[in-house]
Amino acid sequence: MKYKFSHNFISYNLFLFVFMSLILLPYSHASSMGFNTSQHKFSVRTGETRIIYPLSSVKGVSLSVTNPQDYPILVQTQVKGEDKHSPAPFMATPPLFRLDAGMRGRVRVTRTGGNFPEDRESLQWLCITGVPPKEGDVWDNSQHDKKNNMQDVNLNILLSVGTCMKLLVRPDQLRQKPEEMAGKLIWHRNGQQLQVNNPTPFYMNFKSVSLGNKNIKLSSAGNENYVAPFAERSFSLPVDMAERPAEINWQIINDLGSESQVFKANI
């Protein structure tokens, strides 16, 4: 018996064979290759948790920064306003510098202008970010791994980690410390809201707040855990907390970044 194949039939099967070969070729090739995933974090460790900037300072203030990684990073510095977005009348130097593995450097913050009140603190933010290298940079350590693994598939994840720390501009006439006045905070309850009034000229940065035997989530007041000078803010209370007299306890973070004593009041 003789079979007759049309020209169109042969062309179609030839096309199908070539098409499937092109699809399967990368998979067969990948099976013989290694797939490597690595992650490099670019972060900076600071020697302080906050900066107290005397309003009359001319020379500015400085702080130490450390590269905790075992590879070099770039460090980017800038000062922002209280909203963490608007520019601030301060200059951080150097604005961009290299910090080798395990090494420590210093950043200086200097005021460049601005009008600040004389009767209370003002809040700015010093933001420090670890910056990874661009592909092709001489100091990019991943280039060496790429050359040694040309036959492998490499996924190198670079994580840039930034942090913003409080820059508290303090007038010279404020002789006391925040922890010396933290006991003057006024607390009261309004339904499921715990409200605090700050009659002092200092930013009060809370470490902990508890009402009765329940800890209050400071994040419920927003992204920050402080109350501004001569201002008020609210914290959400647990829904199951009954409205009855209770003792409130609070601690603040002092100028050194440590916990204060426990302050108490009845509300």
Curated annotation (Swiss-Prot):
Gene symbol of the encoding locus: myfB
Organism of provenance: Yersinia enterocolitica
Similarity comment text for this entry: Belongs to the periplasmic pilus chaperone family.
N-terminal signal peptide: 1-34
Lineage: Bacteria, Pseudomonadati, Pseudomonadota, Gammaproteobacteria, Enterobacterales
GO CC, alphabetical: outer membrane-bounded periplasmic space
Record protein name field: Chaperone protein MyfB
Matches recorded under Pfam families: PapD_C, PapD_N
InterPro entries given in the database record: Ig-like_fold (IPR013783), PapD-like_sf (IPR008962), Periplasmic_pilus_chap (IPR050643), Pili_assmbl_chap_C_dom_sf (IPR036316), Pili_assmbl_chaperone_bac (IPR001829), Pili_assmbl_chaperone_C (IPR016148), Pili_assmbl_chaperone_CS (IPR018046), Pili_assmbl_chaperone_N (IPR016147)
Lineage top rank: taxon: Bacteria
Swiss-Prot/TrEMBL keywords: Chaperone, Disulfide bond, Fimbrium biogenesis, Immunoglobulin domain, Periplasm, Signal
Keyword Cytoplasm listed: no
Biological process, per Gene Ontology: cell wall organization; chaperone-mediated protein folding
